[in-house]
Protein backbone atom coordinates (compact mmCIF):
# COMPACT_ATOMS: atom_id res chain seq x y z
CA UNK A 1 0.00 0.00 0.00
CA UNK A 2 2.23 2.77 -1.27
CA UNK A 3 1.59 6.44 -1.80
CA UNK A 4 1.06 6.96 -5.55
CA UNK A 5 1.68 10.72 -5.46
CA UNK A 6 5.09 12.29 -6.02
CA UNK A 7 5.11 13.63 -2.46
CA UNK A 8 6.78 11.21 -0.07
CA UNK A 9 5.15 10.56 3.28
CA UNK A 10 6.43 9.33 6.62
CA UNK A 11 4.57 8.30 9.75
CA UNK A 12 6.72 8.86 12.84
CA UNK A 13 6.02 7.04 16.11
CA UNK A 14 7.69 8.55 19.16
CA UNK A 15 6.42 9.61 22.55
CA UNK A 16 6.46 9.52 26.30
CA UNK A 17 9.75 11.25 27.03
CA UNK A 18 11.93 13.93 25.52
CA UNK A 19 14.54 11.26 24.81
CA UNK A 20 12.17 9.80 22.21
CA UNK A 21 10.35 12.92 21.02
CA UNK A 22 13.21 15.38 20.44
CA UNK A 23 15.34 13.09 18.22
CA UNK A 24 12.21 12.26 16.23
CA UNK A 25 11.43 15.96 15.82
CA UNK A 26 14.93 16.52 14.44
CA UNK A 27 14.27 13.90 11.75
CA UNK A 28 10.77 15.24 11.10
CA UNK A 29 12.07 18.76 10.52
CA UNK A 30 14.84 17.52 8.24
CA UNK A 31 12.46 15.51 6.05
CA UNK A 32 9.88 18.29 6.07
CA UNK A 33 12.52 20.62 4.65
CA UNK A 34 12.95 18.08 1.85
CA UNK A 35 9.22 18.41 1.06
CA UNK A 36 8.16 15.22 2.80
CA UNK A 37 4.72 15.07 4.37
CA UNK A 38 5.15 14.16 8.04
CA UNK A 39 2.51 12.75 10.36
CA UNK A 40 2.88 11.54 13.94
CA UNK A 41 1.43 8.65 15.90
CA UNK A 42 1.34 8.96 19.68
CA UNK A 43 -0.80 8.94 22.80
CA UNK A 44 -2.97 11.78 24.03
CA UNK A 45 -1.72 11.60 27.63
CA UNK A 46 2.00 12.01 27.01
CA UNK A 47 4.25 14.92 26.08
CA UNK A 48 4.06 14.34 22.33
CA UNK A 49 0.43 15.50 22.40
CA UNK A 50 1.66 18.99 23.30
CA UNK A 51 5.09 19.15 21.68
CA UNK A 52 4.40 17.78 18.22
CA UNK A 53 1.66 20.28 17.23
CA UNK A 54 3.84 23.09 18.64
CA UNK A 55 6.42 22.15 16.01
CA UNK A 56 3.85 22.21 13.22
CA UNK A 57 3.17 18.50 12.68
CA UNK A 58 -0.18 16.70 12.67
CA UNK A 59 -0.58 13.92 15.21
CA UNK A 60 -2.99 10.99 15.56
CA UNK A 61 -3.60 9.26 18.88
CA UNK A 62 -4.08 5.62 19.77
CA UNK A 63 -5.05 4.11 23.13
CA UNK A 64 -2.09 2.22 24.55
CA UNK A 65 -0.19 2.05 27.84
CA UNK A 66 2.84 0.16 29.03
CA UNK A 67 2.44 -3.27 30.64
CA UNK A 68 5.82 -3.83 32.29
CA UNK A 69 5.57 -3.99 36.06
CA UNK A 70 1.78 -3.70 36.29
CA UNK A 71 -0.81 -5.95 37.93
CA UNK A 72 -1.99 -9.36 36.74
CA UNK A 73 -5.42 -8.24 35.49
CA UNK A 74 -3.89 -5.49 33.41
CA UNK A 75 -1.39 -7.93 31.91
CA UNK A 76 -4.18 -10.37 31.04
CA UNK A 77 -6.10 -7.57 29.33
CA UNK A 78 -3.01 -6.28 27.54
CA UNK A 79 -3.24 -8.50 24.41
CA UNK A 80 -6.78 -7.29 23.71
CA UNK A 81 -5.79 -3.66 24.23
CA UNK A 82 -2.79 -4.09 21.95
CA UNK A 83 -5.02 -5.61 19.25
CA UNK A 84 -7.35 -2.62 19.50
CA UNK A 85 -4.40 -0.23 19.30
CA UNK A 86 -3.02 -2.05 16.26
CA UNK A 87 -6.36 -1.61 14.51
CA UNK A 88 -6.37 2.09 15.40
CA UNK A 89 -2.85 2.48 14.02
CA UNK A 90 -3.75 0.55 10.88
CA UNK A 91 -6.65 2.93 10.19
CA UNK A 92 -4.22 5.86 10.42
CA UNK A 93 -1.88 4.12 7.97
CA UNK A 94 -4.71 3.33 5.56
CA UNK A 95 -5.83 6.96 5.59
CA UNK A 96 -2.37 8.61 5.45
CA UNK A 97 -0.69 6.05 3.14
CA UNK A 98 2.91 6.57 4.29
CA UNK A 99 5.83 5.42 2.18
CA UNK A 100 7.75 4.48 5.32
CA UNK A 101 7.09 4.26 9.07
CA UNK A 102 9.75 5.33 11.60
CA UNK A 103 9.55 4.08 15.19
CA UNK A 104 11.66 5.93 17.76
CA UNK A 105 10.26 4.60 21.02
CA UNK A 106 7.28 5.16 23.25
CA UNK A 107 4.02 3.28 23.78
CA UNK A 108 2.61 3.99 20.30
CA UNK A 109 5.59 2.42 18.52
CA UNK A 110 4.53 -1.14 19.31
CA UNK A 111 1.04 -1.15 17.77
CA UNK A 112 2.18 1.22 15.04
CA UNK A 113 5.08 -1.02 14.09
CA UNK A 114 2.86 -4.11 13.93
CA UNK A 115 0.32 -2.18 11.85
CA UNK A 116 3.06 -1.09 9.44
CA UNK A 117 4.18 -4.69 8.95
CA UNK A 118 0.59 -5.88 8.41
CA UNK A 119 0.08 -3.09 5.89
CA UNK A 120 3.24 -3.89 3.95
CA UNK A 121 4.89 -0.55 4.76
CA UNK A 122 8.68 -0.46 5.36
CA UNK A 123 9.39 -0.11 9.09
CA UNK A 124 12.51 1.63 10.37
CA UNK A 125 13.40 1.46 14.07
CA UNK A 126 15.77 3.76 15.92
CA UNK A 127 16.92 2.93 19.47
CA UNK A 128 18.36 5.86 21.41
CA UNK A 129 19.64 3.97 24.46
CA UNK A 130 22.55 1.55 24.76
CA UNK A 131 20.09 -1.11 25.99
CA UNK A 132 16.98 -1.40 23.79
CA UNK A 133 13.53 -0.88 25.21
CA UNK A 134 11.09 -3.78 25.24
CA UNK A 135 9.09 -2.43 22.28
CA UNK A 136 12.10 -1.98 20.01
CA UNK A 137 13.51 -5.32 21.10
CA UNK A 138 10.34 -7.06 19.92
CA UNK A 139 9.84 -4.97 16.78
CA UNK A 140 13.46 -5.45 15.70
CA UNK A 141 12.50 -8.93 14.50
CA UNK A 142 10.02 -7.59 11.95
CA UNK A 143 11.61 -4.25 11.02
CA UNK A 144 12.94 -3.48 7.56
CA UNK A 145 15.92 -1.67 9.10
CA UNK A 146 17.17 -1.33 12.68
CA UNK A 147 19.21 1.71 13.69
CA UNK A 148 20.87 2.47 17.01
CA UNK A 149 22.85 5.23 18.66
CA UNK A 150 25.58 3.13 20.27
CA UNK A 151 27.63 0.02 19.47
CA UNK A 152 26.49 -3.43 20.68
CA UNK A 153 22.92 -2.35 21.45
CA UNK A 154 21.09 -5.33 19.95
CA UNK A 155 21.97 -9.00 20.40
CA UNK A 156 21.75 -11.17 17.27
CA UNK A 157 20.07 -8.42 15.24
CA UNK A 158 22.04 -6.58 12.54
CA UNK A 159 21.75 -2.91 13.45
CA UNK A 160 23.36 0.14 11.89
CA UNK A 161 25.02 2.57 14.32
CA UNK A 162 23.93 6.10 13.36
CA UNK A 163 24.04 8.06 16.62
CA UNK A 164 21.22 10.09 18.15
CA UNK A 165 19.64 12.95 16.20
CA UNK A 166 20.14 16.17 18.16
CA UNK A 167 19.38 19.83 17.59
CA UNK A 168 21.48 21.45 14.88
CA UNK A 169 22.23 24.39 17.20
CA UNK A 170 24.15 22.06 19.53
CA UNK A 171 26.05 20.50 16.65
CA UNK A 172 27.04 23.99 15.51
CA UNK A 173 28.12 24.84 19.06
CA UNK A 174 30.41 21.82 19.20
CA UNK A 175 31.97 22.68 15.86
CA UNK A 176 32.56 26.34 16.70
CA UNK A 177 33.97 26.09 20.23
CA UNK A 178 36.84 24.41 22.04
CA UNK A 179 36.96 23.43 25.71
CA UNK A 180 37.96 26.46 27.79
CA UNK A 181 41.38 25.87 29.35
CA UNK A 182 41.65 29.30 30.96
CA UNK A 183 42.54 29.16 34.65
CA UNK A 184 39.48 30.98 35.95
CA UNK A 185 36.55 29.81 38.07
CA UNK A 186 35.39 26.28 37.33
CA UNK A 187 31.91 26.60 35.82
CA UNK A 188 29.73 23.64 36.83
CA UNK A 189 26.39 23.04 35.12
CA UNK A 190 24.05 20.86 37.20
CA UNK A 191 21.10 19.37 35.33
CA UNK A 192 18.67 16.93 36.88
CA UNK A 193 15.85 16.97 34.34
CA UNK A 194 12.57 18.87 34.38
CA UNK A 195 11.77 17.59 37.87
CA UNK A 196 15.33 18.06 39.08
CA UNK A 197 17.34 15.37 40.82
CA UNK A 198 16.89 15.29 44.59
CA UNK A 199 20.38 13.91 45.14
CA UNK A 200 21.93 16.87 43.28
CA UNK A 201 19.69 19.35 45.07
CA UNK A 202 20.62 17.88 48.44
CA UNK A 203 24.39 17.65 47.87
CA UNK A 204 25.44 20.54 45.65
CA UNK A 205 25.07 23.47 48.09
CA UNK A 206 27.45 21.82 50.56
CA UNK A 207 29.74 20.55 47.80
CA UNK A 208 29.99 24.03 46.29
CA UNK A 209 30.82 25.51 49.69
CA UNK A 210 33.55 22.93 50.31
CA UNK A 211 35.17 23.29 46.87
CA UNK A 212 35.07 27.10 47.11
CA UNK A 213 37.42 26.96 50.10
CA UNK A 214 40.27 25.73 47.86
CA UNK A 215 39.23 26.64 44.31
CA UNK A 216 37.18 29.28 42.54
CA UNK A 217 33.86 27.75 41.43
CA UNK A 218 30.57 28.97 39.96
CA UNK A 219 27.46 26.83 39.54
CA UNK A 220 24.40 26.96 37.29
CA UNK A 221 21.92 24.57 38.89
CA UNK A 222 18.64 23.40 37.37
CA UNK A 223 16.68 22.26 40.41
CA UNK A 224 13.34 21.27 38.88
CA UNK A 225 9.79 22.43 39.36
CA UNK A 226 8.87 23.33 42.93
CA UNK A 227 12.42 23.17 44.28
CA UNK A 228 13.67 26.69 43.63
CA UNK A 229 13.05 28.27 47.02
CA UNK A 230 14.46 25.44 49.13
CA UNK A 231 17.65 24.87 47.10
CA UNK A 232 18.29 28.58 46.69
CA UNK A 233 17.87 28.92 50.45
CA UNK A 234 20.45 26.19 51.04
CA UNK A 235 23.01 28.03 48.90
CA UNK A 236 22.22 31.34 50.63
CA UNK A 237 22.56 29.78 54.08
CA UNK A 238 26.12 28.75 53.17
CA UNK A 239 26.92 32.16 51.70
CA UNK A 240 27.22 30.76 48.17
CA UNK A 241 24.34 32.58 46.49
CA UNK A 242 26.70 35.11 44.90
CA UNK A 243 28.47 32.45 42.83
CA UNK A 244 25.43 30.36 41.92
CA UNK A 245 22.59 30.63 39.40
CA UNK A 246 19.59 28.60 40.55
CA UNK A 247 16.75 27.94 38.11
CA UNK A 248 13.72 25.66 38.07
CA UNK A 249 14.31 24.90 34.41
CA UNK A 250 16.90 25.95 31.83
CA UNK A 251 15.16 26.76 28.56
CA UNK A 252 18.31 27.61 26.59
CA UNK A 253 20.56 24.56 26.83
CA UNK A 254 22.75 25.93 24.05
CA UNK A 255 23.64 28.88 26.29
CA UNK A 256 24.10 26.59 29.30
CA UNK A 257 26.46 24.23 27.47
CA UNK A 258 28.36 27.18 26.03
CA UNK A 259 28.84 28.58 29.55
CA UNK A 260 29.88 25.34 31.28
CA UNK A 261 33.29 23.76 31.85
CA UNK A 262 31.83 20.53 33.21
CA UNK A 263 28.34 19.07 33.58
CA UNK A 264 26.90 17.07 36.49
CA UNK A 265 23.88 15.18 35.22
CA UNK A 266 22.03 11.93 34.62
CA UNK A 267 22.94 9.71 31.68
CA UNK A 268 19.91 9.73 29.42
CA UNK A 269 20.72 8.80 25.83
CA UNK A 270 20.05 12.27 24.47
CA UNK A 271 22.12 13.91 27.21
CA UNK A 272 25.08 11.63 26.50
CA UNK A 273 24.87 12.38 22.78
CA UNK A 274 24.61 16.12 23.39
CA UNK A 275 27.63 16.12 25.72
CA UNK A 276 29.65 14.34 23.06
CA UNK A 277 28.51 16.72 20.32
CA UNK A 278 29.40 19.87 22.26
CA UNK A 279 32.60 18.34 23.67
CA UNK A 280 31.88 18.83 27.37
CA UNK A 281 33.44 16.80 30.22
CA UNK A 282 30.87 15.40 32.60
CA UNK A 283 30.23 13.67 35.90
CA UNK A 284 27.47 11.18 35.18
CA UNK A 285 25.14 9.82 37.85
CA UNK A 286 22.79 7.38 36.09
CA UNK A 287 19.18 7.35 37.25
CA UNK A 288 19.14 4.25 39.46
CA UNK A 289 15.55 3.25 38.63
CA UNK A 290 15.89 3.37 34.83
CA UNK A 291 14.52 0.25 33.12
CA UNK A 292 17.27 -2.39 32.79
CA UNK A 293 19.71 0.19 34.22
CA UNK A 294 20.16 1.46 30.67
CA UNK A 295 21.55 4.82 31.80
CA UNK A 296 24.66 3.13 33.20
CA UNK A 297 25.39 1.56 29.82
CA UNK A 298 24.71 4.93 28.13
CA UNK A 299 27.23 6.54 30.48
CA UNK A 300 29.90 3.96 29.64
CA UNK A 301 30.11 5.35 26.09
CA UNK A 302 31.63 8.59 27.43
CA UNK A 303 33.41 7.00 30.39
CA UNK A 304 35.21 4.43 28.22
CA UNK A 305 36.30 7.22 25.87
CA UNK A 306 37.78 9.17 28.79
CA UNK A 307 35.28 12.00 28.48
CA UNK A 308 33.35 11.48 31.71
CA UNK A 309 33.47 10.24 35.29
CA UNK A 310 30.86 7.70 36.42
CA UNK A 311 29.44 7.97 39.94
CA UNK A 312 26.64 5.46 40.60
CA UNK A 313 24.04 6.95 42.92
CA UNK A 314 24.41 4.00 45.29
CA UNK A 315 27.90 5.21 46.23
CA UNK A 316 27.45 8.93 45.61
CA UNK A 317 28.18 11.26 48.51
CA UNK A 318 29.46 14.80 49.03
CA UNK A 319 33.08 13.71 49.46
CA UNK A 320 33.18 11.96 46.08
CA UNK A 321 31.70 14.97 44.30
CA UNK A 322 34.08 17.34 46.07
CA UNK A 323 37.03 15.18 45.05
CA UNK A 324 36.04 15.04 41.37
CA UNK A 325 35.43 18.79 41.15
CA UNK A 326 38.69 19.59 42.92
CA UNK A 327 40.57 17.37 40.45
CA UNK A 328 39.00 19.17 37.50
CA UNK A 329 39.53 22.61 39.02
CA UNK A 330 43.20 21.81 39.66
CA UNK A 331 43.99 20.36 36.23
CA UNK A 332 42.47 22.43 33.46
CA UNK A 333 44.56 20.62 30.86
CA UNK A 334 42.89 17.33 31.82
CA UNK A 335 39.51 19.07 31.69
CA UNK A 336 40.28 20.10 28.11
CA UNK A 337 41.43 16.61 27.19
CA UNK A 338 38.22 15.11 28.60
CA UNK A 339 36.19 17.46 26.40
CA UNK A 340 38.20 16.45 23.35
CA UNK A 341 37.77 12.76 24.14
CA UNK A 342 34.01 13.24 24.57
CA UNK A 343 33.85 14.91 21.16
CA UNK A 344 35.76 11.98 19.63
CA UNK A 345 32.73 9.70 20.09
CA UNK A 346 30.18 12.19 18.76
CA UNK A 347 28.14 11.30 15.68
CA UNK A 348 27.01 14.68 14.42
CA UNK A 349 25.16 13.59 11.27
CA UNK A 350 22.72 11.20 12.96
CA UNK A 351 19.67 13.12 11.74
CA UNK A 352 20.79 12.82 8.13
CA UNK A 353 21.67 9.14 8.55
CA UNK A 354 18.24 8.24 9.95
CA UNK A 355 16.50 10.28 7.26
CA UNK A 356 18.62 8.76 4.49
CA UNK A 357 17.59 5.24 5.51
CA UNK A 358 13.92 6.29 5.39
CA UNK A 359 14.42 7.93 1.99
CA UNK A 360 16.18 4.85 0.61
CA UNK A 361 13.42 2.48 1.73
CA UNK A 362 10.71 4.77 0.37
CA UNK A 363 12.42 4.84 -3.03
CA UNK A 364 12.70 1.05 -3.11
CA UNK A 365 9.04 0.57 -2.40
UniProtKB/Swiss-Prot annotation:
Membrane-spanning ranges:
none
Keywords recorded for this protein, A-Z? Cell cycle, Cell division, Cell inner membrane, Cell membrane, Cell shape, Cell wall biogenesis/degradation, Glycosyltransferase, Membrane, Peptidoglycan synthesis, Transferase
Task: Tell me the Gene3D superfamilies matching this sequence.
Answer: Glycogen Phosphorylase B (3.40.50.2000)
Q: Name one Pfam family in it.
A: Glyco_tran_28_C
Q: Could you tell me the superkingdom of the organism this chain comes from? A: Bacteria
Belongs to which family? Belongs to the glycosyltransferase 28 family. MurG subfamily.
Q: Which InterPro entries match?
A: GlcNAc_MurG, Glyco_trans_28_C, GlycoTrans_28_N
- Does the keyword Magnesium feature in the UniProt annotation? no
* Name the record gives this protein: UDP-N-acetylglucosamine--N-acetylmuramyl-(pentapeptide) pyrophosphoryl-undecaprenol N-acetylglucosamine transferase
Pathway named in the protein's UniProt entry: Cell wall biogenesis; peptidoglycan biosynthesis
Q: Summarize where UDP-N-acetyl-alpha-D-glucosamine binds, as residue positions.
A: 17-19, 129, 167, 194, 250, 269-274, 295
Q: What biological-process terms (Gene Ontology) are attached?
A: carbohydrate metabolic process; cell division; cell wall organization; lipid glycosylation; peptidoglycan biosynthetic process; regulation of cell shape
Its cellular-component GO annotations read:
plasma membrane
Q: What does this protein do?
A: Cell wall formation. Catalyzes the transfer of a GlcNAc subunit on undecaprenyl-pyrophosphoryl-MurNAc-pentapeptide (lipid intermediate I) to form undecaprenyl-pyrophosphoryl-MurNAc-(pentapeptide)GlcNAc (lipid intermediate II).
* Catalyzed reaction equations: di-trans,octa-cis-undecaprenyl diphospho-N-acetyl-alpha-D-muramoyl-L-alanyl-D-glutamyl-meso-2,6-diaminopimeloyl-D-alanyl-D-alanine + UDP-N-acetyl-alpha-D-glucosamine = di-trans,octa-cis-undecaprenyl diphospho-[N-acetyl-alpha-D-glucosaminyl-(1->4)]-N-acetyl-alpha-D-muramoyl-L-alanyl-D-glutamyl-meso-2,6-diaminopimeloyl-D-alanyl-D-alanine + UDP + H(+)
Q: Keyword Membrane, does the record have it?
A: yes
Its localization reads: Cell inner membrane
Broad EC category: transferase
Return the NCBIfam families for the record: murG
Any idea which GO molecular function terms this record carries? Answer: UDP-N-acetyl-D-glucosamine:N-acetylmuramoyl-L-alanyl-D-glutamyl-meso-2,6-diaminopimelyl-D-alanyl-D-alanine-diphosphoundecaprenol 4-beta-N-acetylglucosaminlytransferase activity; undecaprenyldiphospho-muramoylpentapeptide beta-N-acetylglucosaminyltransferase activity
Task: Give EC number(s), comma-separated.
Answer: 2.4.1.227
Membrane topology term: Peripheral membrane protein
